[in-house]
Design a protein with these regions (language model features):
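Glycan-recognition and catalytic cores of secretory/periplasmic carbohydrate-active enzymes
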Residues: 1-135
Length: 135
């Protein structure tokens, strides 16, 4: 978003560096939905982080060379498929209307751990819309 609004190449470089860090992290699960902390594999997954990553990758794919763009779109699609599975997506009419379960807000304080969180739904819908609008 910073690059889109400013055109400052430093923002694009930082976004690419962040994306590469995430996608190449040895503790990133195969389905693309990260643990609440990359340094704590095997603990709770964080659907909200997955949704943010998917949305960010799809936006970033608009500003990078074609091959890199394809890689980011594939990674975002993998995350969206995972989040759309029964593991993360709540059944209609359940979970008080939340779309996604299994998000983490503040694990060190024991707050919002393995629960639905509204911003997870927001970024999930944003990512789905971005994916749908791909050329």
């Amino acid at each position: 978003m910073c690059y889109r609004e400013t055109g400052d190449a430093r923002y694009l470089a930082r976004a690419v560096k962040s994306a590469e860090y995430i996608l190449n992290h040895p503790n990133l699960p195969k389905d693309g939905v990260p643990y609440w902390d990359f340094d704590r594999p095997g603990e709770e997954r964080d659907a909200s982080a997955g949704a943010v990553i998917a949305s960010g990758l799809l936006e970033l794919s608009e500003y990078v060379p074609h091959e890199q763009s394809r890689r980011y779109v594939r990674a975002a699609r993998r995350i969206l498929r995972s989040l759309s599975s029964d593991r993360y997506l709540n059944a209609a009419g359940s979970a008080h209307g939340f779309l996604l379960s299994h998000s983490v807000g503040h694990k060190p304080k024991g707050s919002q751990v393995d629960v639905p969180i509204i911003y997870a739904d927001y970024y999930f819908l944003e990512a789905l819309l971005r994916y749908r609008q791909l050329d």
